[in-house]
Amino acid sequence: MTKYKPKFIDVETLQDARKEIKKIGSDPQSIEIMAPKAISKVIKLENVLLQDAIIIKQDMLSLGGEVAVPKNTFELHDKTGDILVMGTIKQLHELVDKLDRHYPRLKNIAKELAVLLRSIK
């Protein structure tokens, strides 16, 4: 059983993307910025420590992808939250490589993502 429950979610239209970003509690003003970037593969990770979410977001942004995080992530009021990782298959594989260079908790997330990405046909 996996800890972060990575799974693909169906995001085929901008409306789908807006709904999923809103559902995890992102700032409403950020939805229109992030939704167009979601038309690729979108992976939801559950119960991610918010300090890890910030690093995952920074790494994915450096690859040209996006990570939607809860509105108050950078204030660290909550300990964990759900996040949406959005990118092309190539960007997602590159993210796995980047996360695998970090500390053990992020390496574990990288391993779970790698398993999920191997399921893409």
Q: Where are each of the predicted segments found?
A:
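A generic structural motif
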Residues: E75-K90
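Conserved, mostly hydrophobic/aromatic
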Residues: M60
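A short, structured beta-strand/loop element
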Residues: G64-E66
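Flexible, glycine/charged-enriched surface loops at secondary-structure junctions
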Residues: V69-N72
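Short glycine-/aliphatic-rich beta-strand segments at the starts of folded cytosolic domains
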Residues: I33-V48
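N-terminal amphipathic alpha-helix/helix-capping segment at the start of soluble metabolic enzymes
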Residues: T2-P36, T80, A110-K121
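Non-catalytic propeptide/linker segments at domain boundaries
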Residues: K90-K121
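Phosphorylation-prone, low-complexity intrinsically disordered regions
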Residues: Q51-D52
